[in-house]
């Protein structure tokens, strides 16, 4: 289903060691610049409907920290969109109350995705902070009791790489609908924290995830960015099946590049300000950028010195759009083999 990813804010109540976003960590309720204005949200939804988009993926920051979170859900539901959102589960009872406050909000909720980065409290809390593991597990149990579809998203790094089997088992125990594993994108911060696995280990991670896919009843998958022998882009942002709107109301190429932690200024991936122009106008600019990226990838695919990089497409985009100056990971992109 074509969907729009919308960043509600650029604020979070955790300070996770692996986070790749440049985000305000702490209380910022009075800083309006960090929250998507609701009139901009409604404008985007009105303009996206005739283009065939019917679902909103709400991200952040921590989306429920938007001071008008419930009103934002009313706008989404009222415009006929289904939605889901990603959360770290902090203050989840308040979040659940907001979701359930109006019948249409609850009816249009397709599910809630939870960030869970360890099969044990020790591992998860080492990455995300004290008590966060219990908050996530409790929140998922609350969703199950209320009939809300819950999913788990895990970023694999050195701290939790050994827990893939246990994480899948935990997902089954918690009766989640789906479970997604993804690689850790590099930043100066998480490279400095020694969290990034060597690129040569990524294939082993993918094999472990592929193995657990067949051993459990719930849906287990790898997030886009895993090893591929198909050199030309086929991810949802580069086919326009996923649009990404940042918290400033701007159309960007991809959520994985948006507000990147090492970036000190806007890059070419920011294509249009939807406060000032229509979604159709900005989407035309995005199409031009996507066509440019396709041509660049084609040139790389026929260049023996460059084509090996294309096995990991997300890393290619991180390099292409200058999102990090962290060289060790980018150097490893040449010469990747099965």
Annotate each PLM feature.
Residues 105-111, 115-277, 281:
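Radical SAM enzyme [4Fe-4S]-AdoMet core and its adjacent flexible, acidic
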């Amino acid at each position: 289903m074509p969907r729009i990813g919308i960043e509600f804010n650029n604020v979070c109540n955790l300070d996770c060691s692996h986070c790749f976003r440049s985000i305000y960590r702490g209380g910022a309720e009075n800083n309006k610049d960090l929250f998507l204005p609701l009139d901009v949200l409604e404008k985007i939804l009105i303009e996206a409907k005739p283009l065939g988009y019917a679902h909103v993926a709400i991200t952040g920051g921590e989306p429920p920290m938007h001071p008008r979170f419930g009103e934002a859900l009313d706008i989404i539901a009222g415009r006929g969109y289904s939605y889901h959102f990603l959360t770290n589960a902090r203050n989840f009872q308040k979040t659940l109350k907001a979701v359930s406050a109006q019948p249409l909000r609850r009816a249009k909720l397709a599910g809630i995705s939870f960030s869970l980065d360890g099969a044990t409290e020790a591992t998860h809390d080492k990455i995300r902070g004290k008590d966060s593991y219990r908050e996530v597990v409790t929140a998922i149990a609350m969703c199950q009791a209320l009939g809300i579809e819950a999913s788990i998203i895990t970023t694999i790094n050195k701290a939790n790489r050994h827990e893939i089997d246990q994480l899948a088992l935990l997902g089954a125990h918690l009766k989640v609908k789906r479970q997604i594993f993804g690689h850790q994108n590099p930043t100066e911060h998480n490279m400095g924290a020694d969290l990034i696995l060597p690129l040569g280990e990524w294939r082993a991670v993918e094999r472990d995830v592929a193995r657990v896919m067949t051993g459990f009843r719930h849906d287990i998958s790898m997030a886009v960015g895993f090893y591929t022998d198909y050199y030309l882009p086929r991810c949802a942002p580069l086919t326009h099946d996923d649009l990404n709107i940042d918290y400033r109301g701007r159309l960007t190429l991809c959520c994985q590049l948006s507000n990147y932690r090492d970036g000190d200024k806007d890059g070419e991936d920011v294509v249009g300000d939807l406060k000032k122009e229509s979604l159709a106008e900005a989407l035309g600019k995005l199409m031009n950028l996507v066509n440019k990226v396709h041509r660049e990838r084609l040139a790389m695919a026929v260049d023996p010195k460059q084509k090996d990089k294309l096995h990991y497409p997300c890393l290619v985009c991180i390099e292409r759009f200058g999102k990090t100056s962290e060289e060790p990971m980018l150097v490893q992109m040449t010469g990747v083999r099965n």
